[in-house]
């Protein structure tokens, strides 16, 4: 697994991480199976795990899994997501409880009350509970506001959507991140599963075999990771074997411009 520097955070993270939206929002008997996904990811070299209080039980389930399989091997990225000051305090207190008193990467989710939440996260950083601060948004309509935050100098990295069917961030967000030295975490690199469900025929992957591509999901991940401005891509999965497969996409070699365009054409079919 290749490791990449996450912008000004000073941290190195695995090129492929693990997202937890929907897949770790479980209770009771389903929790053990999801713990195994986290264990498989760690075993495969994945170090970055992304969550949010917006994701239901995901933070708690992830925290329990990391306690079982190796919190010290993980870089936890979670978020604060509320316009209410008291709720923001509660969210951060809960997250610190879930993750053994420290959060490596703390993000303002979807820029909600961004300036006030940055104040809170900066205080936690001063207290030694947070290592690095970022901001996220999923919508192209919010990219101008996100870029204002990037220019403000208060974040070390951003999390934005990037996949073979959605390259909007390449127009302005990625160039600005590169200029400012900010890290980039790519959300929905598989299009929230939509692109994987539209997999091309195996014969169409033959031109990509020399890059270690075994599956369409790996081709999609290598498309994102072949952009050197991306620090980490965070696909989500509920299956240990898929976590292992996804992790292998984080190994060089990565695509050149010809292969990237080929994957884009396949994704548009």
Residue ranges and their predicted role:
Residues 96-116:
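Active-site groove signature of glycoside hydrolases
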Residues 20-32, 77-86, 136, 205-211:
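Active-site mouth loops of central-metabolism enzymes
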Residues 28-41, 84-99, 140-149, 216-221:
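Short, acidic/polar
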Residues 15, 48, 102-105, 132, ...:
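Residues at the N-termini of beta-strands
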Residues 3, 82, 109-269:
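Beta/alpha (TIM)-barrel catalytic core signal, keyed to glycine-rich beta->alpha loops juxtaposed to Asp/Glu
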Residues 1-74:
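N-terminal binding-site loop/beta-alpha segment at the start of enzyme catalytic domains
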Residues 72-84, 104-110:
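A short, structured active-site edge motif that brings together acidic residues
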Residues 7-10, 63-73, 93-101, 122-126, ...:
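Acidic (Asp/Glu)-rich catalytic clusters
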């Amino acid at each position: 697994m290749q490791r990449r520097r996450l912008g000004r955070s000073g941290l190195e993270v695995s090129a492929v991480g693990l997202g937890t939206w929907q897949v770790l929002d479980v209770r009771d008997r389903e929790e053990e199976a999801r713990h195994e996904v986290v264990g498989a990811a760690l075993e495969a070299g994945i170090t970055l795990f992304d969550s949010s209080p917006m994701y239901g039980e995901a933070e708690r389930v992830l925290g329990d899994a990391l306690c079982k399989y190796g919190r010290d091997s993980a870089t936890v990225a979670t978020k604060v997501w509320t316009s209410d000051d008291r709720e923001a305090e509660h969210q951060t207190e809960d997250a610190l409880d879930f993750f053994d008193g420290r959060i490596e990467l703390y993000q303002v989710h979807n820029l909600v009350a961004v300036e006030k939440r940055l104040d809170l996260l900066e205080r936690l950083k001063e207290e030694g509970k947070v290592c690095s601060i970022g901001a996220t948004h999923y919508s192209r309509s919010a990219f101008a506001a996100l870029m204002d935050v990037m220019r403000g100098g208060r974040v070390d990295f951003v999390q934005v959507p990037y996949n073979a069917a959605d390259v909007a961030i390449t127009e302005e967000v990625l160039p600005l991140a590169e200029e400012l030295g900010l890290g980039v975490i790519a959300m929905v690199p598989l299009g929230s599963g939509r692109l994987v469900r539209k997999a091309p025929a195996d014969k169409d992957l033959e031109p990509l075999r020399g890059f270690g591509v075994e599956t369409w999901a790996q081709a999609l991940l290598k498309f994102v990771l072949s952009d050197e401005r991306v620090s980490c891509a965070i696909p989500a999965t509920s299956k240990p074997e898929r976590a292992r497969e996804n992790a292998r996409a984080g190994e060089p070699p990565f695509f050149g411009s010809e292969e990237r365009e080929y994957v884009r054409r396949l994704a548009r079919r």
